[in-house]
Amino acid sequence: MAAGEGDVGMEVETKAPAMPPPPPASSSAARKKKQARAKNGDTPEPDAAGGARARASRRAKRGPGSYRGVRQRRWGKWVSEIREPNRGKRHWLGTFGSAVDAALAYDKAAASILGPRAVLNFPAFSPPAAAIAAPEQCEPPFCSPATTAAATAPEQRQTPGCSPAAVAGSGGGAVFEERDVKPVVLPLPLPAILQDGGGTEAMAQHWDWEWDASWPELEMFECLDDIAMYLDVDAVMTTRDCKVEELDADIVDSPLWTLSD
């Protein structure tokens, strides 16, 4: 009997311990969600009442002199800035000596950006949004109503022949068309001395030339004799249909015209 009791005791001692029951599925899912939030650095979203209490507590911590969009530097100055609601862009408004001045700057910027939807620090002292958005107009002194109307009215001038009816082509065709235009060549008027029948001597007297004198500048015309040696005047006059009319005989009988002889 003693041996049998010992065998039973050994069997009881070698039996595996019982496992604890698994936790419910809802508690495990909540725990995993909480761990994921802690890993990402997110905080649980409070309800409306909790959010209002949190904002009130933060406002109480900042003190009675704290305003929206205003914070104090360590050396005592106050700075003001504003963020755009949708874009998140921050606009720097400046540094001020007091918190009230910084708050007023924030109110002005918020009213210009958000309009009537802006939440202001001093709603009773803020200017209307229309006055902020509209630019200041400085009227010049001593301006009569007629002068002001003439200056503000746009100047409308219509060039003759540039009306819409003149610009639009008939039948909807093109206004500007390409056309062959021949150049107009006007004959040059002859000097009055040649028109009166005067010759080279008359021209010399008119221009105060000393024709018989030995004028050094007249030597420049000697190069015409060398040039005339290489010109075929008959061929040029035949191709160009040139006619020498109403010229004095002394001019026509120059070395340039007698090369073919």
Swiss-Prot record:
Give the GO biological process terms: positive regulation of DNA-templated transcription; response to stress
For this UniProt entry, the molecular function terms from Gene Ontology, in alphabetical order, are: DNA-binding transcription factor activity; transcription cis-regulatory region binding
InterPro entries from the entry? AP2/ERF_dom, AP2/ERF_dom_sf, DNA-bd_dom_sf
Kindly state which keywords UniProt assigns to this record, in alphabetical order.
Activator, DNA-binding, Nucleus, Stress response, Transcription, Transcription regulation
Q: Name one GO cellular component term.
A: nucleus
Segments for region (Disordered): 1-72
DNA-binding region extent: 66-123
Question: Which compartments is it annotated to reside in?
Answer: Nucleus
What broad class describes the main subcellular location of this protein?
nucleus
The source's superkingdom equals Eukaryota
Give me the disulphide-bonded residues: none
User: Which family does this protein fall into?
Assistant: Belongs to the AP2/ERF transcription factor family. ERF subfamily.
Instruction: Give the protein's biological function.
Output: Probable transcriptional activator that binds to the DNA sequence 5'-[AG]CCGAC-3' of the cis-acting dehydration-responsive element (DRE).
The protein's name is Dehydration-responsive element-binding protein 2D
Species the sequence originates in: Oryza sativa subsp. japonica (Rice)
